[in-house]
């Protein structure tokens, strides 16, 4: 065979005892897609600088098939803040438990380096007038709110990042322990408990000395949290429309693998019907500057909690007839309440409808290698969906996709 007679050949050298065998297989260049050219969708944790929150555009511009799917976190923080203000405005003076004219609150912070945690804390503090320009613990000033037509001072008694003994953030056990300490320290000075997510809020409720009826607000609309709202235990939470996010992750991949380009990638089946008539029902937006699909948020209270109960899926997404594609998906923490109880079940519900064969690998929530070490056999997959442990780890994944 002449050297140039099979320019698209791949050559692999197999060594055997006492012999070397040259294996030559010919295939068309168009038959092979390099990993670096495959769709890559980051989700739930936007590639970004953990200190400044600036989006990591090097990761987002890895290739022209790289996108992020999340939710409008800043708007969500505002929704949570407004929900708390509305609650106070409609409350009686007895919400001030010790009658000192001050609404005191404690704050469970998820992760000081996480964009979602930052903007949720900002939304809360802006609404209550305690915002100083920083989302860090201890950085709050005296604010003001109206309770039953009367103005009250608002004080953040303490804000704390809930980090577990294993280093994991957004930690439920840490929230339980902290709540117990807060009750012992502040007693009836605590008028509200506010949390960056439902997992920590539910952890607070598990404290043995949690004051019965003390108002508490979470975020995520996890199934157990929504049920808790219905029981009158949790005062309110915020839905980030996880079904819309899960469908968007899969739909973008489906669009790219089906050959869509340009606006069709981020619109078909998302903001307008695709060829199968599918379209996400909840409001979503495309932020072109950061290549992100963002779902809207909504508050969940005693007035509407039944609309968010488990099992309500998007009727706008139905079975498609497209070829099955294989996708490797990472989850940063197998123990994360939101991902385990809401996001993954949604992904697993919609993936078969879009003929996406998901392989899910899960990490421990603290060490990126717990995901990266399972981010293997990449040639077997048509696309990748990545939920990182740390928001600045985008390059760790794209480095593995170079070839």
Curated annotation (Swiss-Prot):
S-diacylglycerol cysteine-type lipidated residues: 26
Entry membrane topology: Lipid-anchor
Entry keyword Transit peptide: no
Primary location recorded for the protein, binned into one broad class: membrane
RNA-binding found in the keyword field: no
Lipidation (N-palmitoyl cysteine): 26
Signal sequence, start to end: 1-25
Cited InterPro entries: Bact_Solute-Bind_Prot2, MglB-2_Peripla_BP, Peripla_BP_I, SBP_2_dom
Keywords: Cell membrane, Lipoprotein, Membrane, Palmitate, Signal, Sugar transport, Transport
GO molecular function: carbohydrate binding
Function: May be involved in the transport of sugars. May have a role in chemotaxis.
Protein name: Glucose/galactose-binding lipoprotein
Organism of provenance: Treponema pallidum (strain Nichols)
Native organism taxonomy: Bacteria, Pseudomonadati, Spirochaetota, Spirochaetia, Spirochaetales
């Amino acid at each position: 065979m002449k050297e140039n007679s099979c320019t698209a050949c791949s050559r692999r050298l197999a060594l055997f005892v006492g012999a070397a065998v040259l294996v030559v297989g010919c295939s068309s260049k168009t038959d092979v897609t390099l990993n670096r050219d495959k769709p890559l969708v980051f989700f739930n944790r936007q590639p970004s600088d953990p200190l400044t929150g600036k989006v990591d555009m090097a990761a987002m511009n890895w290739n022209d098939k790289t996108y992020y799917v999340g939710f409008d976190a800043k708007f969500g923080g505002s929704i949570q803040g407004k929900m708390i203000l509305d609650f106070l405005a409609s409350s009686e003076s007895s919400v001030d438990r010790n009658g000192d004219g001050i609404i005191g609150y404690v704050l469970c912070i998820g992760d000081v380096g996480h964009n979602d945690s930052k903007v949720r804390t900002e939304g809360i503090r802006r609404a209550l007038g305690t915002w100083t320009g920083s989302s860090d613990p201890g950085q709050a000033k005296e604010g003001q709110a109206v309770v039953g037509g009367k103005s009250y001072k608002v004080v953040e008694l303490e804000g704390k990042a809930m980090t577990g003994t294993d280093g994991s953030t957004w930690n439920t056990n840490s929230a339980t322990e902290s709540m117990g300490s807060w009750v012992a320290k502040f007693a009836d000075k605590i008028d509200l408990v506010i949390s960056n997510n439902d997992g920590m809020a539910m952890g607070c409720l598990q404290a043995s000395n949690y004051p019965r009826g003390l108002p508490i607000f979470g975020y995520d609309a996890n199934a157990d949290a929504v049920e808790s709202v219905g029981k009158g235990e949790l005062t309110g939470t915020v839905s980030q429309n996880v079904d819309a996010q899960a469908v968007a992750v899969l739909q973008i991949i489906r669009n790219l693998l089906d050959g869509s380009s340009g606006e069709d990638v981020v619109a078909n089946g998302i903001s307008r019907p695709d060829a199968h008539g599918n379209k996400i029902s909840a409001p979503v937006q495309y932020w072109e500057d950061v290549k992100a699909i963002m779902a809207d948020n909504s508050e969940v209270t005693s007035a509407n909690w039944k609309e968010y109960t488990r099992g309500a899926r998007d009727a706008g997404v139905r079975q498609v007839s497209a070829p099955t594609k294989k996708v490797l998906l990472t989850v940063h923490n197998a123990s994360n309440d939101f991902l385990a109880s809401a996001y993954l079940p949604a992904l697993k519900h919609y993936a078969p409808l879009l003929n996406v064969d998901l392989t899910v690998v899960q990490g421990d929530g603290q060490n990126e290698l717990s995901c990266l070490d399972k981010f293997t056999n990449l040639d077997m997959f048509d696309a990748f969906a990545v939920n990182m442990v740390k928001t600045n780890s985008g390059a760790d994944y794209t480095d593995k996709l170079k070839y």
